[in-house]
């Protein structure tokens, strides 16, 4: 089994963190300011997270948004987590994408309800 890149984070500068989770800028951003929030404990997806880990992700999500709003001034956000290879997950360590969106940018993600 290969080592999990989100457990080691080689060469990655931590943007924000709390006791159970941390945030850093995505190495392959969809847009300017794209951040990933990951749990410090290695778990493969959001459904394995404890209530405490979910709360820590929520806490960082708010703090990340505040910082990105100050620096990048986006017009909106996409926030999400892929679970399983069929959904597009390629790194099997829980991570939540926080993707700032800007008026007129390409690649709009739309979920139909």
Explain the meaning of each model-derived region.
Residues 1-113:
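HIT superfamily nucleotide-processing domains
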């Amino acid at each position: 089994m290969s080592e999990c890149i989100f457990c080691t984070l080689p060469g990655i500068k931590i943007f924000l963190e709390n006791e159970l989770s941390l945030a850093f800028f995505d190495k392959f951003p969809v847009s300017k300011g794209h951040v990933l929030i990951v749990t410090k404990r290695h778990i493969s997806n959001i459904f394995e997270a404890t209530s405490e880990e979910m709360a820590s992700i929520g806490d960082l999500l708010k703090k990340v948004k505040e910082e990105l709003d100050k620096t990048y001034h986006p017009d909106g956000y996409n926030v999400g987590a892929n679970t399983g290879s069929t959904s597009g997950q390629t790194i099997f360590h829980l991570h939540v994408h926080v993707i700032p969106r800007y008026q007129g940018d390409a690649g709009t993600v739309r979920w139909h309800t």
